């Protein structure tokens, strides 16, 4: 009996230790966790590791992209290291809410629907949803997609825009739905192989990918009427200090010319929003 009690006590201590260790690696969703990030000197950012040129995995297994470089520069200002966590993009808000990641940062459009769940930083870059089609298909405007098969990434801004503005594409495409993909790469493969006729996608991704692959001349990239978007960083509602710190770093990096240097590397031009250019911590 005495041995049993000792074993139970040891098991209780072990479970307590393991739970404590696990909880220390997960941020509390209901608290402002800035002091914890400072203490650990680490923050976890969730991203889609196929979204070129914003954040993607290279052939050697390392991560690269505009958002990767920008986020690393932001947290370097505070002596905090970024842990990059690839996630299912369709589950991004869930991963944020449950504390698995601390930020969503990867070409994340700040929409009214998302603002209900997420605290956004100031927008740092503009974007729009465009349609990509093969030139040989002669699809050059939205109406040309009548009865055609459309593709989009699940959980993407493009898919949200498709559902929210049915008059633009949903009412005319085949079956009034978009084939959903887990990544843009998968969708582009299907477009190349004629399994879909058009792909709703971020302009920055389309231009960069098709240019890098040397196939831009084989495709048409055009607007179909969706409103332009703004990329911002998403945090939990309680993490207001974190949001302010990111905003402050945006402004500082721009004033020092570092923001522009990163933008030039990936886009060949300064893409900062007016909010970034004018931001000063009050």
Residue ranges and their predicted role:
Residues 91, 108-116, 161-164, 189-193, ...:
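A ligand-binding cleft/hinge motif common to bilobed small-molecule-binding domains
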Residues 49, 126-133, 203, 211-248, ...:
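Periplasmic-binding protein-like
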Residues 26-107, 245, 256:
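Extracytoplasmic small-molecule ligand-binding "clamshell" domains
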Residues 85-86, 90-103, 117-119, 143-146, ...:
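Short helices/loops that flank or line small-molecule/ion binding pockets
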Residues 36, 133-150:
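Flexible hinge/capping segments at coil-to-helix
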Residues 23, 68-77, 143, 148-149, ...:
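Extended ligand-binding regions for polar small-molecule ligands
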Residues 18-21:
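C-terminal motif of bacterial Sec signal peptides marking the signal peptidase cleavage site
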Residues 57, 71-80, 158-180, 210-215:
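Ligand-binding cleft/hinge of the Venus flytrap
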């Amino acid at each position: 009996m005495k041995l049993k009690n000792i074993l139970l006590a040891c098991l209780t201590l072990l479970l307590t230790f393991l739970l404590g260790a696990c909880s220390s690696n997960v941020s509390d969703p209901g608290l402002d966790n800035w002091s914890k990030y400072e203490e650990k000197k680490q923050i976890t950012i969730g991203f889609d590791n196929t979204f070129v040129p914003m954040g993607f995995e290279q052939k050697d297994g390392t991560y690269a992209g505009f958002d990767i470089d920008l986020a690393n520069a932001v947290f370097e200002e505070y002596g905090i290291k970024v842990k990059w966590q690839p996630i299912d993009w369709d589950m991004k808000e869930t991963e944020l809410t449950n504390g698995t990641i601390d930020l969503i940062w990867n070409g994340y459009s700040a929409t009214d629907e998302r603002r209900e769940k997420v605290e956004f930083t100031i927008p740092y870059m503009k974007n729009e949803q465009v349609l990509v089609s093969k030139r040989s298909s002669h699809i050059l405007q939205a109406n040309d997609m009548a009865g055609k098969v459309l593709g989009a990434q699940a959980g993407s801004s493009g898919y949200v825009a498709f559902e929210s503005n049915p008059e633009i594409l949903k009412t005319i495409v085949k079956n009034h739905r978009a084939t959903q993909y887990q990544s843009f790469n998968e969708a582009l493969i299907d477009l190349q192989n004629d399994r879909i006729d058009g792909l709703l996608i971020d302009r920055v991704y389309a231009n960069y990918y098709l240019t890098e692959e040397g196939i831009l001349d084989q495709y048409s990239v055009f607007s179909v009427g969706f409103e332009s978007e703004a990329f911002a960083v998403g945090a939990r509602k309680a993490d207001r200090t974190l949001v302010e710190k990111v905003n402050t770093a945006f402004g500082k990096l721009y004033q020092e010319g570092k923001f522009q240097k990163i933008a030039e590397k990936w886009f060949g031009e300064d893409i900062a929003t007016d909010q970034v250019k004018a931001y000063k911590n009050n």
